[in-house]
A protein has these predicted regions:
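Short, structured protein-protein interaction patches enriched in aromatics and acidic/basic residues
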Residues: 31-51
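An N-terminal amphipathic alpha-helical segment
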Residues: 1-24
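C-terminal edge-of-domain segments
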Residues: 49-71
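Sterically constrained small-residue positions within well-ordered secondary structures
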Residues: 23, 43, 55-57
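Low-complexity, flexible helical/coil segments
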Residues: 12, 38-42, 66-71
Length: 71
């Protein structure tokens, strides 16, 4: 699944991302594109046991790849 949150104002990117996370099954991958690094999202992901990777893009946006782990 892929979400493009560029151009959206807070808290909409976070809300869209959390909703998509709820729909994920174990092993699923979600890729989001944000204008900013979603620092509050990282805390949420760590608390819920998701793994993630953050990449800076050439256009200045951030690509975050999230994987739902078991447990």
């Amino acid at each position: 699944m892929r979400l493009d949150n560029r151009g959206l104002q807070p808290p909409e990117p976070m809300q869209r991302t959390l909703k998509a996370l709820e729909e994920m099954n174990i092993g699923d991958k979600l890729t989001i594109i944000n204008d900013r690094k979603p620092m509050f999202l990282f805390e949420e992901l760590e608390q819920k046991g998701y793994s993630y990777e953050v990449n800076s893009r050439e256009d200045g946006a951030f690509e975050i790849i999230i994987i739902k782990k078991e447990g």
